[in-house]
């Protein structure tokens, strides 16, 4: 799998997820074998205005390479300037967000709003492509109706403008994450495109990932929500791709990851911010496990790393997991 000049080791990609795919989490995904990790979506205006909070979203470490930075905005000139800053930061790939359907983003003419404004989208892609040399990708949805016409049109425009790959989540902008992802849209786009197509949506297991690759013939799979509490899904997918036996769930390892995620988040964000953030993140790791409800309640008000680790260890012990 290759995106422009960047060669990926395999066909697995971590989706950009707001509030989730920060540096500590990306490192977990990379450790599990993910070939390409993506930042949270980064505001082009925030970068150009040198917002420290926005700039920090691009923090990176060599071991997570290659890294894709996703930017969003609606002004071609601002997006071009932001793209230049991303390239200067050392990112390997720039991704443009055409899929976010959050009301605030759409209201400002960015994200999925651009799927209804193909001329603006074209100007934006051209300006970014002209501003940088590193590979450029786009991530989009089906559009504002289920036919896929808007996605096919924008993909054709993007390819003509020099985009190196397209990632698609085949739900409409109004669906958000409701209903089912229509994988037939991915298959149809793959037939039309002459550049790599990355499939995203409803990959809840390694089997789902293989099914998507086989049914749509997409070049790679992008995994988002299912990786939040289970980053080892990438190693499970890789095993299936290689025809190997899928690694069995290992609770000891699962809890080791939880503990490390907590510790690395404290190192990166500081104890107060990390504890507040991890109250919800740790719940994803507890999903489907016995006593998860009790654990969720126990971490609702954690305020120190020591307290958090005690709760995690107590949860582990309640499941009779060996230390």
Which residues make up each language-model segment?
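Short hydrophobic/aromatic-enriched beta-strand-loop microsegments
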Residues: 37-39, 93-96, 219-223
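N-terminal small/glycine-rich loop or linker at the start of catalytic domains
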Residues: 1-13, 45-67, 100, 105-108, ...
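Aromatic- and acidic-residue-enriched carbohydrate-binding clefts of CAZyme catalytic domains
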Residues: 115
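Alpha/beta catalytic cores of nucleotide-metabolism and tRNA/nucleoside-modifying enzymes
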Residues: 4, 8, 12, 18, ...
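Alpha/beta enzyme core
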Residues: 80-94, 98-110, 119-195
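Glycine-rich, positively charged N-terminal anion/phosphate-binding segment
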Residues: 2, 17-92
């Amino acid at each position: 799998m290759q995106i422009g000049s960047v060669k990926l080791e395999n066909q697995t990609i971590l989706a950009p997820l707001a509030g989730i795919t920060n540096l500590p989490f990306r490192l977990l995904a990379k450790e599990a074998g993910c070939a390409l990790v993506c930042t949270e979506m980064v505001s082009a205006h925030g970068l150009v205005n040198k917002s420290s909070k926005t700039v920090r979203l691009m923090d990176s470490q060599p071991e997570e390479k290659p890294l894709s930075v996703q930017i969003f905005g609606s002004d071609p000139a601002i997006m071009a300037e932001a793209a230049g800053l991303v390239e200067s930061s050392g990112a390997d790939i720039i991704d443009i967000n055409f899929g976010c359907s959050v009301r605030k983003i759409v209201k400002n003419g960015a994200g999925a709003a651009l799927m209804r404004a193909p001329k603006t989208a074209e100007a934006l892609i051209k300006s970014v492509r002209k501003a940088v040399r590193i590979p450029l990708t786009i991530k989009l949805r089906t559009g504002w109706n289920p036919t896929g016409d808007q996605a096919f049109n924008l993909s054709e425009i993007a390819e003509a403008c020099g985009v190196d790959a397209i990632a698609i989540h085949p739900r409409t902008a109004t669906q958000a994450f409701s209903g089912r992802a229509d994988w037939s849209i991915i298959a149809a786009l793959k037939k039309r495109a002459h550049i790599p197509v990355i499939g995203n949506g409803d990959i809840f297991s390694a089997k789902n990932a293989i099914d998507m690759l086989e049914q749509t013939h997409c070049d790679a799979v992008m995994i988002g929500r299912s990786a939040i509490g289970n980053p080892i899904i990438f190693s499970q997918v890789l095993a299936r791709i290689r025809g190997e036996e899928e690694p069995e769930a290992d609770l000891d390892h699962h809890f080791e990851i939880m503990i490390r995620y907590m510790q690395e988040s404290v190192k990166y964000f500081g104890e107060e911010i990390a504890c507040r953030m991890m109250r919800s993140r740790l719940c994803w790791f507890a999903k489907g496990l016995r006593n998860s409800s009790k654990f969720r309640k126990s971490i609702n008000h954690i305020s120190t790393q020591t307290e958090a680790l005690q709760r995690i260890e107590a949860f582990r012990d309640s499941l009779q997991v060996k230390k």
